[in-house]
Regions:
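Kelch-like beta-propeller repeat domains
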Residues: 18-191
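Bacterial Sec-dependent N-terminal signal peptides
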Residues: 1-20
Length: 191
């Protein structure tokens, strides 16, 4: 009895800190590997992946999925995207032709429109780090047919200009962890 009471005292406080999951509407598109995903306060977006070129929007207000116009770039895997406000920026990956594209795109979430931006001037890649800090997007690491990469780039969304920065300290890598806090980008680990 004492053991049971002790177990209850230990586990009861943890119940209040457990996560609660709710099922939402199932995704209406085809299942996929490594799509581009991003969101704003109202919608979540799933685009491309598994060499598909479709795009979908999830509306949390009515728990529905809507298929949008197809992405204007070649379908690809391992692409990445981030957003600043209601604009998403995306590129990179690996396409059906075995290429590592360097095209760079802006997607307007409010009116489902696309704008091709300045191409990435470095080597195409998959699994890069992509971090937003203020109005700049930092991209680096990743890998391609040459192996792991360690270069680091800054994209200014206000001027549509890419600038190469100092390479990452340490080993070249792909698929690292990454995040931005305040005015700093943090990157580490990876393969």
């Amino acid at each position: 009895m004492k053991n049971l009471l002790l177990l209850a005292l230990i586990t009861l406080p943890l119940v209040g800190f457990s996560q609660l999951w709710n099922q939402v509407s199932n995704f209406t598109g085809e299942g996929r590997h490594h799509p581009i995903t991003f969101s704003n306060d109202n919608y979540g977006f799933v685009m491309s992946g598994s060499n598909l070129n479709d795009a979908h929007k999830y509306d949390k207000s009515n728990d529905t999925w809507t298929q949008l116009q197809n992405v204007p770039f070649s379908s690809r895997n391992y692409s990445y995207g981030v957003n600043i406000g209601d604009k998403a920026y995306m590129g990179f990956g690996y396409d059906l032709n075995g290429q590592f594209p360097t095209d760079w795109w802006q997607y307007d979430m409010n009116n489902d429109s696309w704008l091709q931006l300045a191409n990435f001037p470095g080597s195409g890649r998959l699994h890069p780090a992509m971090i937003v800090v203020n109005n700049k997007i930092f991209v680096g690491c990743g890998n391609n047919s040459s192996g792991n990469l360690g270069d680091w780039w800054e994209y200014d969304v206000l001027t549509n200009v890419w600038t190469q920065k100092s390479n990452i300290i340490g080993n070249n890598r792909h698929h690292p962890y990454y995040f931005g806090i305040g005015n700093y980008a943090y990157v580490g680990f990876g393969h």
